[in-house]
Amino acid sequence: MTRLPKQGLLLLQSLALLSSAFGNIIPNTDNCCILDGRFGEYCPTTCGISDFLNRYQENVDTDLQYLENLLTQISNSTSGTTIIVEHLIDSGKKPATSPQTAIDPMTQKSKTCWMKLTDMKNYYQYEENILYLQEVYSSNQNKIFLLKQKIANLELQCQQPCRDTVQIQEFTGKDCQEVANKGARLSGLYYIKPLKAKQQFLVYCEIEPSGSAWTVIQRRLDGSVNFHKNWVQYREGFGYLSPNDKTEFWLGNEKIHLLSTQSTIPYVMRIELEDWSNQKSTADYSTFRLGSEKDNYRFTYAYFIGGDAGDAFDGFDFGDDPSDKFYTSHNGMQFSTFDKDNDKFDGNCAEQDGSGWWMNRCHAAHLNGKYYQGGTYSEADSGPSGYDNGIIWATWRRRWYSMKSVTMKIMPLNRYGAEGQQTLGGSKKSDFENRGDF
């Protein structure tokens, strides 16, 4: 296609404008200023323009003719180009035959093969997963079978009495002393049945070489049992009995009542204490009794026999008030728990001190108190109440000192005194030198 030079196009446009604008103007000498033959140099009027056109008309016409021919060629070339472009467009709409078209079937086959290979890979992966799941299932089935066997064994054990799983001696009696009288010589777990009891129950019997036997009613030694219990729990008992006497428990107020009131022969209660320096001390009380539930398990004893721990059950003068000793004595007090308040205090001693006990206002002895490691504790340690709530025996150690271990046990009075034990009538004064600071 021939291109029209840029100068030709510009000339064509200029001549076209001049031809259309001045083609009908006829020169008139009346309005022309003939000063110079050069166009418009001194007199640029229409007269000069007409003269210029007349002079160059022939050349302009020749150039115009040339340009018209050139435009015709351009037009023809443009038409041809348009036809070619339309043909190419139409050709592009149809699938082109190329080398790619020839290999399309192979590509499709390869793609199909690849898809089949992928499917096979997935299939084998599924097979592996299925095998793994089958192994897991089989393993779980074995575990379930073993667990069912264990459950069956446990169910068989639970159907048998507790004595089949612990070492319980065959002797029995109304208390541990009667068990020893029947020939028992080893300390351990025994069943006893007090005279008024409806059924026998398990106790720990501490049997001495002389044949005298203590029935243990309370044990503290490591803080493993929480003694913050309600009325029913203290009535029935809680904690754990063990053949080696290495567990904490409260035998139960109802059992203690049946034991201590079954005979005309009174019982002696012994309190055994151990501090955190491993020093030990005792306090013995004659004619210990625990009333019935109707009397809220009232605690009574006849007198303090002796013991270097001192008579904390008789109260103690802490120096806080002239009435301290009177309001901290325990003889004759009823049992109190946080849900059954029987103390002499306007508040609830059992609730603020976190235990069940024979509270007055409140205590000088508190053997069911909170277990504090190391012994010494403070008001901040005792919680919101700020009261002395540890395992306390105020006549031996200060009120802010909690014992390491405690045992409460009873024995018939007629067996008390064997092998050098303190005898009735030989009571000692309390040793007040070891009270500690209050």
Swiss-Prot record:
Key word Disulfide bond present in the record?
Answer: yes
Ranges for domain Fibrinogen C-terminal come to 167-414
Q: Name one GO molecular function term.
A: metal ion binding
Entry protein name: Fibrinogen gamma chain
What role does this protein play?
Together with fibrinogen alpha (FGA) and fibrinogen beta (FGB), polymerizes to form an insoluble fibrin matrix. Has a major function in hemostasis as one of the primary components of blood clots.
Signal peptide (residue range): 1-25
The UniProt entry's GO CC annotations, sorted and at most eight, read: fibrinogen complex
**Free-text description of this protein's post-translational modifications in UniProt:** Conversion of fibrinogen to fibrin is triggered by thrombin, which cleaves fibrinopeptides A and B from alpha and beta chains, and thus exposes the N-terminal polymerization sites responsible for the formation of the soft clot. The soft clot is converted into the hard clot by factor XIIIA which catalyzes the epsilon-(gamma-glutamyl)lysine cross-linking between gamma chains (stronger) and between alpha chains (weaker) of different monomers.
Which BP terms in the Gene Ontology apply to this protein? Answer: blood coagulation, common pathway; fibrinolysis; platelet aggregation; positive regulation of heterotypic cell-cell adhesion; protein polymerization
Which residues, renumbered to this chain, are glycosylated? N76
Q: Which gene encodes it?
A: fgg
Question: How the protein assembles, per its UniProt entry?
Answer: Heterohexamer; disulfide linked. Contains 2 sets of 3 non-identical chains (alpha, beta and gamma). The 2 heterotrimers are in head to head conformation with the N-termini in a small central domain.
**What's the entry's take on its domains?**
A long coiled coil structure formed by 3 polypeptide chains connects the central nodule to the C-terminal domains (distal nodules). The long C-terminal ends of the alpha chains fold back, contributing a fourth strand to the coiled coil structure.
Q: Which residues cross the membrane?
A: none
Cellular localization per UniProt: Secreted
What positions does the entry give for Ca(2+) binding? D341, D343, G347
State the organism of origin. Xenopus laevis (African clawed frog)
Annotated keywords: Blood coagulation, Calcium, Coiled coil, Disulfide bond, Glycoprotein, Hemostasis, Metal-binding, Secreted, Signal
Is Metal-binding found in the keyword set?
A: yes
Any S-S bridges, and between which cysteines? C176-C205, C349-C362
